[in-house]
């Protein structure tokens, strides 16, 4: 028996293949696969259930129906193996060959393969250079095509209708040949000589001028080269022989009642065979042409339906009106082969049950019901029972387990000890959704889960279910214990903060313990140790919140790393002293000597992990939880209706607001304000009233007045249960309390606009009918949103995982000096994220110098940990270059140094870590917390957005960034450049705030001047755009003719007159060509030049510009010549939340994107056309000038004669990522996407490390477009993988040849996934048909480099613990293979197996 097992093991080893290739099958290849031709459409005999001969289930072709038994029953048993029965012709062998043996159908007329015909772009059409429409007309017998023109005037491939064909026949007789149907296409394809075509097109390409024609020829050239290189022949796209799937893969099962359940494929095959046989008969009978044609067309249609039903025309339906499932449908979609069976499999040794709380468990334990454990660990139990001699055979062991003998439980305890199980909760959004625990046997039927891991699973106990999986092999147990154990997953992989932070009851309990109250029992006592304080509490001498003095002992680590004990007396409370008992040695008492809210506890755990390491943190977290639960019980905090205290001021505040609203209403009726203004003001009034009410309510709730020891009144924080819950962060928030005890406030309509009558009642008072009705809108919308959100978020995660799945850390250091420049993130002047948070856990790319010196502070390649970040802060460094995966030079992966710290472990990342998947999960997992709405900015929001000054928040020194300025007559600076920024820096040189200021800003302070907090340092007019002069002189009007190019207007209120330039459209014909401008001249009338240039100082005036000067008026530097009114920007919808993140990662172009300058140079405007203006940029160095047509309604930021830098904004709008990449480079686009994505997440309070977003961006930038091919084999304009081009260039440079140049390209994540090198990965993602068609034509081979491909072929993934296995294989492939064991063929193997089985049978 042993030999038998050994032999079976040897069999099951798969061939060690290096890759998978896909191609077109030639008719001969199909015949070589086949074991016989299927000639009849019959399936099985309905009486005997035996397969019909030569039918679709024929045993002669496909193999026997029963193991080792022929159909007629003449040969049975193993000894006749391999005999072919002379009576029924069936080979005696195993039934499983019916899963692998194929048949074939010889088609009476060739048929086009629908994939190569209809999947766009049509491969057959491209090959023949004909349109799809024409080819279809030939294939479906509507017109003829010329195959051999002979000496006639016809051309090969020309279409002829029936009439044209008959005319041509009369004219030329049989000089020429024209046919219809697939035969014609077949002959055309066969006539193509690939090599000649390639040569011709390669010669033709350089001489082509028209862009479209060049594109077309390049496409065709690529296709023909693909065919030529892969060895596929074009005529194989037309089928002459159709393969038939093995019958066990399209089963037919008899149901009771004489009916059959069958796979749709059988119906489709029957159709094909029927039509094929009929066509053969018709051809034998020499039937009339029209009948044969019709039959051929029907055959073509039936083969189309078999291969891909519904791609052409209506889908063929079965008896119950549903479309039949064709071969293509079998592999694509969520239910197809790839996603259903290859990527998602069901698992043995698993169970699921409801979860309940296990508050007494340790962090690494879970409670497993005995029943479940018994079932899951059965094989182990059987083995143990047999091993202990309690059962003689496996059967006996089985009986014992079924009877549940007492011994079984002892064995079960033994088996379970130290054997981790894995718990999983669906949906598994990130890797913390599966963790390993040690099982503890419990009574009952529910799994017990440790409360602290709920946050990671996102689990609650309202009926959630979880699945249990058992790792079987020793290796699997080892991995589960060392990598997946819940105690090893304390930090979140998304942001590196603890994920096992207490919540809810625990927080409430700890908060209650650490609160203090005035004049509590035992106040003022002093204790000589914590133990004494505890004793006082236990005996009731002092209560938990009493303010007392306690002497505590702390263990601290000094500079030398020695542990030193210190003792001191602190003012604290009894409760906090009790907390110090569970505080691990080495942490300071100050950490718990405060009100312990959720944030404080989280910080405490984080500090503990960073200072004391994993083990202490785990023990401490458990202790915190037990303590929290205990004191939450003791506190007796509960919610009663009287806890919701309504403030007395509420009613007066509401009455005041109502009065104000009435007043506005009257103003509106007397026509003083517009309807829009009234609406906005009313909303404002109610919003502020709501704020006031909630403030009054919170003041009321949060403090109470008590009598202290001296008999005086003293305010203390309230012990109101609802307030405590909200304040500690256990449950609820100020906004929710406001609805309970304040007023509900303004509600939104279903379309998102705000209803102007608010709900003034709260839940304690109760709502009346109309208020309740208004409330239902929001509630329903919320639920509908949630449902949509979940699906959308899941789909985003799927796309992200797919694009990043093959990114793995594969080397230690790529040695690049490149990196991203990190600065503190500043929004609206505030520092949102300081530099230390952005660079923590990164590697420095270039030496960082001490500010103002040449001394190296941080050497290159240092991993910045907490200590280094303190150094950065102390030396007030405000920017540094750190390594990033975006600039990593590793091919097909990244290096550890460019990635930096593994966030979930806290050290530099290991090789083989699948950072792509981690990044995708970290971004996708919080997706469900993001909103789905698009915000309309209307009313209140848009009014606030028109800023007109900068008010500083911190005192410091003023600095200007890329700003040009002139000094006006008052000595103030006027900014004359775009995209200038002001920064405020403190005395250490750290940047505190930063503001963008527009052109024409007047600064109140000079550069490097000190500013005070709250000072206004810059002003500008938000509604008009000035034109500032840079020289002093007097004005001279050119082409300014009243009534032709301008008009004079007088303001009624002020009596001042101003000149308004007319828009081109409004001018009379005489003024159409004129260009009104103001020239500045010196006193003698000579032209003035702009300082430092040879350009005369003249300013062109665009339409609608307002000039407040007269001709020949004197003017100073920095004065405004003219003002251009800005239309208030239309209220744009701001896409927020999930859709915004998806847009960024899909790199979608916004509707009206900002227009950026393509080159650096000087702006001028050319001749205008209808509705558009022509913008011309002339580069300073000479060279071609660049022109662009811009619609008139776009607000331009530039005037004639102004200089712009490449990539500067010319017309406002949302910027398109593609433009940023093209004009400002890869680092800018990376920063843009990272910051925009982070903005969305930050708004929801979700923290994600920038690294993860950068990983996805790296994958979006994988491809490039070849600009100049050099000596490489790429084509210009071709899309190629960057690493491929880099490798090819290295080889070319080594040979001293010309390398290819390329432009990086930004692809959206869906596009990038579909464009990966691996066709298996792309096909299992989306658009399966298109991907496989393209791969087959190019004869692509998949090197199985990514994770997905390896999962699909059933290997270990090349990441994590499977990384070394793949490394070894790669090394083995490089070394010549050692002497292999003699290969054994399948037939020999079966022979050996049979002999062994016979031996085994006889020895029983």
From Swiss-Prot:
Q: Which reaction does it catalyse?
A: RNA(n) + a ribonucleoside 5'-triphosphate = RNA(n+1) + diphosphate
A GO molecular-function descriptor: zinc ion binding
Q: Which GO terms describe its biological process?
A: DNA-templated transcription
Q: Which domain of life is it from?
A: Bacteria
Top enzyme class: transferase
Sorted alphabetically, the keyword list is: DNA-directed RNA polymerase, Magnesium, Metal-binding, Nucleotidyltransferase, Transcription, Transferase, Zinc
Q: Which GO terms describe its cellular component?
A: DNA-directed RNA polymerase complex
Q: Which Pfam families match?
A: RNA_pol_Rpb1_1, RNA_pol_Rpb1_2, RNA_pol_Rpb1_3, RNA_pol_Rpb1_4, RNA_pol_Rpb1_5
The cofactor note reads:
Binds 1 Mg(2+) ion per subunit. Binds 2 Zn(2+) ions per subunit.
Instruction: Detail which positions bind Zn(2+) 2.
Output: 814, 888, 895, 898
Give the SUPFAM superfamilies listed for this entry.
beta and beta-prime subunits of DNA dependent RNA-polymerase
Q: Which cofactor does it need?
A: Mg(2+); Zn(2+)
Query: Which residues participate in Mg(2+) binding?
Result: 460, 462, 464
Residues that hold Zn(2+) 1 according to the record = 70, 72, 85, 88
Which EC number(s) does the record attach to this protein?
Answer: 2.7.7.6
Give the similarity note.
Answer: Belongs to the RNA polymerase beta' chain family.
General function of this protein: DNA-dependent RNA polymerase catalyzes the transcription of DNA into RNA using the four ribonucleoside triphosphates as substrates.
Instruction: Report quaternary structure and partners.
Output: The RNAP catalytic core consists of 2 alpha, 1 beta, 1 beta' and 1 omega subunit. When a sigma factor is associated with the core the holoenzyme is formed, which can initiate transcription.
Its protein name is: DNA-directed RNA polymerase subunit beta'
- Species assigned in the record: Shewanella piezotolerans (strain WP3 / JCM 13877)
